[in-house]
Amino acid sequence: MAEETRQSKLAAAKRKLKEYWQRNSPGVPAGAKRNRKTNGSIHETATSGGCHSPGDSATGIHGESPTSSATLKDLESPCQELAVVPDSRSVKVSQLKNTIKSLKQQNKQVEHQLEEEKKANNEKQKAERELEVQIQRLNIQKGKLNTDLYHTKRSLRYFEEESKDLAVRLQHSLQRKGELERALSAVTATQKKKAERQFSSRSKARMEWKLEQSMREQALLKAQLTQLKESLKEVQLERDEYAEHLKGERARWQQRMRKMSQEVCSLKKEKKHDKYRVEKLERSLSKLKHQMAEPLPPEPPAVPSEVELQHLRKELERVAGELQAQVEYNQRISLLNEGQKERLREQEERLQEQQERLPEQEERLQQLAEPQNSFKELNNENKSVLQLEQQVKELQEKLGKERLEAASQQKQQLTAQLSLMALPGEGDGGGHLDSEGEEAPRPIPSIPQDLESREAMSGFMDHLEEKADLSELVEKEELGFFQYYRERCHQKVYHPITKPGGSAKDAAPGGGHHQAGPGQGGDEGEAAGAAGDGVAAGGDYKGHSKFLVTAQNPAHEPSPGAPAPQELGAAHKHGDLCEVSLTDSVEPVQGEAREGSPHDNPTAQPIVQDHQEHPGLGSNCCVPFFCWAWLPRRRR
């Protein structure tokens, strides 16, 4: 298209030139006409060459610039000839030059358009090639999709055939099932008749045996209920006694604190008096030294001066002795203060250890309560007994909470008192006891300024005693629960070991038929085992109450709050505060409880022997693994 437009423009330009020369031809001389003819022939050849064969047009794309330059040269030659023409033709010459310039510009525009068209053609060719490549890819994908579709159709046909085969087989199996059900119904009808005949003869004896077994279990449960009620009453009595004992101990300690505060006030007054007296003596001593340093007057009589000197020397020696004694006493008090500080640190460490042990003991109690909850779910027939056990536990938890609240309150008071102990003169709380223990002719020495340290010490001792009582109770409860679960676990271990024909009296304390035969009485054996477990729990509660009675009010031991008289005397002699050895008082009680538990509970004796033979059983507070392995057996 671009070549055609270019050729049409060239043809139009040539026509315009012809018309122009034809117009201006009559006034031109013969030489000019000749030139015009020659130019016309050249133009005709150029036009004929421009409109010639397609081969000439193909060459004209690249060869049009030389033809146009030739035409321009032809046009310039007549212009040079026209320069000779008069001035009337100069205007025409200028017009011709303008037309030449316009033709040159048109030529440049045409060349520029040709280049742009070439670029567009190249881009179109590239786009066509890319489209061809994409078409090829699409054709390849189409072929793959066709193959996939063919394979899927083939697999669908295969699955349809298989489904038809399966439907046919299912119909055959349903028919076979119906035939088998008919045959089985006929067989079961005959077997039911035979079984009913056999069962009618055996059911009477089994029902009688079940009735006897249920009566025995009911009697055992009633006995267990009575034992648990008695143990609950004993626990309540022990709680009341312990509360009264705590009230008495608190009153006694309050009275003791009042006495100590009165003593502290009196010691304050004595300290002030002693300070005043020491200052007075120091003044008199300084005066005496000053008098001795001054020269004696020459005229005084000899006898009174010697008497005065002796008197002054004696008084000086006495004052020096008092000062020396005061210094020694202060040194002793500093040593006692250091010892008291060390004891306070030790007691604080013990208190921290007990506080760290409390969460561990709570975790142990929770671990012991978890298997108890599982036994509740398993033993549905002992719900009433387990409810009573839960009530006892709740009472114990309430007691523990009350004691913990009291301990926390006392701890807050102790922290307040210990913050007061941070004042200067800390730890000098044992001087008055030393002054009371020693009957010396010299005056009462000075007292430390921290007078609240004695009150803090007594409150601290009271708090430690209550902590010791709480730890005793927690350890006793752990012992009771531990022995109870250990007995149950040993009973459950001994249950499958015993022979089918024998009784289970060695394994369970209830005396009932704890185990059943291999083919009869499985549920009855489970109920009897649960009843035996309940009796063991009652026995453990009795033993636990005895442990509490012997631990709280032993006949040969003083109360845990009050120190022994021998210890008080020793404390007065050494000039130290009254300290009660809490750890020593806790350990023998635990030993007595551990020694008395097998004798109180008859079922614990074989268990203790077995535990001594096998120390691995029951060494931890949690339930052993073989008990959990026995539980699915019992569910069956």
Swiss-Prot record:
Organism: Homo sapiens
Superkingdom to which the source organism belongs: Eukaryota
One Gene Ontology term, aspect cellular component: cis-Golgi network
Listed Pfam families: GM130_C, GOLGA2L5
Biased amino acid composition, Gly residues: 509-522
InterPro entries (alphabetical): GM130_C, GOLGA_cons_dom, Golgin_A
UniProt feature coiled coil, ranges: 93-148, 211-263, 306-412
Keywords noted in UniProt: Coiled coil
Residue ranges, annotated region (Disordered): 1-72, 107-127, 344-364, 422-449, 496-537, 588-612
Protein name in the entry: Golgin subfamily A member 8F
Protein family: Belongs to the GOLGA8 family.
